[in-house]
């Protein structure tokens, strides 16, 4: 029931039910948010104790890279199957068992150090992560407070950076990655059981409405009963409304240079992000010689949290000043940010001083994240209006397949080969890959010139047709 409907309720019985409903939804939201934050903390745990993990599992850098990539494979498979499973099974119990599986993948390290068993559980860790990752925003859209859904959605976006920082800092101070994973598992478990005992109606896709009739003694509307809309009928109506978009497929849009270049540019950006975040703890210890808890925790917190957040805000603000991402100048602005990011990428491997390294890495993430909202906006602007929603899905899928998935492994292969002769080689390659991003954005700027001409011609044709109709 929406907040607007709730405001119409005047009976004491109805108000009591609404208060209970609001508290229940608030508790579920808090539980989901904390769980989502903890689910995003595993990357920080691994990064904080990379040397210990390699020693206990008896693996080299190459295998440690695969150890990171296998989680991304699990997430891809999970993403392809999660919506089917959520529609086939009861959502509350599916989320419950997915979180139990997630906790099991965190605790497996206490029982075995066999690399192949661990890799199987790492795959399941990525697979189980997807269920709350996909369902949480959906739940907010359906059951969130009407006037606060935007704020609630914004909180969801903060879970990933805050979770990563929490996992890194907690594990750094605990001193053992197994304790870091155990902390995540034993915090998720009670929250999982709280969700299990919440009423089913707050997880079901069925939509509830309050039936109101004017029979109160003072003429006001009162709540008498609760009825629910049949789920099958709702699905049929939804299917009737949804029609396939006319025109070319979203996949064919990748053949258009203006769209392909911007998607690949964001993919390159995600590749550098993922490789740096996954291996930064290893770089602290083995290259910079920073084993101090406070130094590592402070640098990771500043770089992973403050840099991306302030960069995204600054990039969006500057883009608005030049007319927004619909203007061709936004590609030129993005190219400028990419060059500044590339300069930082060149300087970082040359630095041995921890303070200078922190500043350079902060600026790298700051300027790189200045591009992120602009790149997403440009990708929307480069496709037909009917394909804008699908464009983000394709964009994200390409970023996962070509960015997040290979990044840890590629870094590991390079580091395993050159760490004895040049321990900075892998980080230098990972960071300076950003120059490919600069080339792609410059090409996008070139191709958008033709796009603007086409749009102008279409607009002139439409205006001419309108004038003819008026006559």
Predicted regions and their residues:
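Extracytoplasmic
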Residues: 27-61, 276-281
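Extracytoplasmic gate region of multi-pass secondary transporters
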Residues: 46-47, 256-313, 369-372, 376, ...
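Conserved MFS/SLC helix-loop-helix module at the cytosolic interface between two early adjacent transmembrane helices
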Residues: 77-115
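Structural signature of the two symmetry-related core transmembrane helices
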Residues: 93-107, 329-346
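Cytoplasmic helix-loop-helix junction between adjacent transmembrane helices
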Residues: 121-160
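Glycine-rich segments within core transmembrane alpha-helices of 12-TM secondary carriers
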Residues: 148-175, 304-312, 396-408
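Helix-loop-helix hairpin linking two adjacent transmembrane segments in secondary transporters
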Residues: 156-204
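Symmetry-related core transmembrane helices of the 12-TM Major Facilitator Superfamily/SLC fold
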Residues: 179-197, 425-444
């Amino acid at each position: 029931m929406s907040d607007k409907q709730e405001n119409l309720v005047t009976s004491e019985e109805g108000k009591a039910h609404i208060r209970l409903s609001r508290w229940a939804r608030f508790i579920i939201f808090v539980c989901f948010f904390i769980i989502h934050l903890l689910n995003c903390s595993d990357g920080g745990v691994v990064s904080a104790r990379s040397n210990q993990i390699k020693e206990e599992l008896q693996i080299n850098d190459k295998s440690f890279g695969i150890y990171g990539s296998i989680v991304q494979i699990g997430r891809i498979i999970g993403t392809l199957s999660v919506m089917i499973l959520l529609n086939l099974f009861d959502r509350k119990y599916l989320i419950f068992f997915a979180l139990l599986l997630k906790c099991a993948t965190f605790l497996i390290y206490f029982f075995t150090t066999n690399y192949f068993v661990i890799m199987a559980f790492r795959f399941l860790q990525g697979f189980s992560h997807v269920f709350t990752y996909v369902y949480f925003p959906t739940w907010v859209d359906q059951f969130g407070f009407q006037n606060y859904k935007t704020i609630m959605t914004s909180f969801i976006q903060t879970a990933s950076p805050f979770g990563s920082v929490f996992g890194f800092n907690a594990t750094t101070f605990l001193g053992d990655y197994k304790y870091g994973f155990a902390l995540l598992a034993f915090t998720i478990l009670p929250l999982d059981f709280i969700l299990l005992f919440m009423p089913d109606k707050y997880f079901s896709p069925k939509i509830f409405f309050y039936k109101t009739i004017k029979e109160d003694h003072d003429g006001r509307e009162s709540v008498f009963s609760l009825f629910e809309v049949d789920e099958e009928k709702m699905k049929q109506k939804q299917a009737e409304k949804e029609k396939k978009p006319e025109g070319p497929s979203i996949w064919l849009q990748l053949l258009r240079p203006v769209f392909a270049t911007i998607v690949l540019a964001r993919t390159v950006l995600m590749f550098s992000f993922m490789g740096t975040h996954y291996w930064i703890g290893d770089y602290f210890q083995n290259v910079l010689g920073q084993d101090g808890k406070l130094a590592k925790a402070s640098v990771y917190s500043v770089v992973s949290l403050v840099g991306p957040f302030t960069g995204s805000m600054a990039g969006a603000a500057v883009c608005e000043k030049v007319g927004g991402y619909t203007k061709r100048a936004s590609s030129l602005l993005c190219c400028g940010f990419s060059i500044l990011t590339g300069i930082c990428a060149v300087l970082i491997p040359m630095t041995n001083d921890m303070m200078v390294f922190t500043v350079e890495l902060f600026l790298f993430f700051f300027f790189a994240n200045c591009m992120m909202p602009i790149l997403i906006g440009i990708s929307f602007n480069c496709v037909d209006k009917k394909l804008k929603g699908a464009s983000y899905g394709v964009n994200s899928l390409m970023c996962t397949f070509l960015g997040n998935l290979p990044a840890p492994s590629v870094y590991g292969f390079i580091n395993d080969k050159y760490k004895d002769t040049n321990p900075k080689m892998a980080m230098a390659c990972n960071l300076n890959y950003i120059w490919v991003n600069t080339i792609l954005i410059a090409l996008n700027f070139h191709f958008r010139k033709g796009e603007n001409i086409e749009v102008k011609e279409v607009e002139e044709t439409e205006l001419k047709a309108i004038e003819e109709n008026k006559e």
